[in-house]
Curated annotation (Swiss-Prot):
Source organism of the structure: Listeria monocytogenes serotype 4a (strain HCC23)
Name of the protein: Putative membrane protein insertion efficiency factor
NCBIfam families for this protein: membrane protein insertion efficiency factor YidD
Stretch list, region Disordered: 66-88
UniProt-listed InterPro entries: Membr_insert_effic_factor_YidD
């Protein structure tokens, strides 16, 4: 699913975006953000983050730097909770 979504974004970048004026209010661009979000967080959460970002890309939003949030390390959380419940 990730490959299909990223492929769709790449098609947009290659065949649509390059022929339109640069209007994205953010860095990285919304399409680059979408690819990174899907690569980092997977198809479902990455798509959610991309849609949320695109919904902010309008003339009434100031834009600016907006990077994909890092993926939370699930092992660190489970390791911590495991240590907290382990009796010596």
């Amino acid at each position: 699913m990730k490959k299909i979504l990223i492929g769709g974004i790449r098609l947009y970048q290659k065949y649509i975006s390059r022929f339109t004026p640069a209007t994205c209010r953010f860095y990285p661009t919304c399409s680059a953000y979408g690819i990174e979000a899907i690569q980092t967080h997977g198809a479902l959460k990455g798509s959610y983050l991309a849609i949320r970002r695109i919904s902010k890309c309008h003339p009434f939003h100031k834009g600016g730097l907006d990077f994909v949030p890092p993926k939370k390390d699930k092992n660190a959380d489970s390791e911590h909770s495991c240590k907290a419940h382990h009796h010596h």
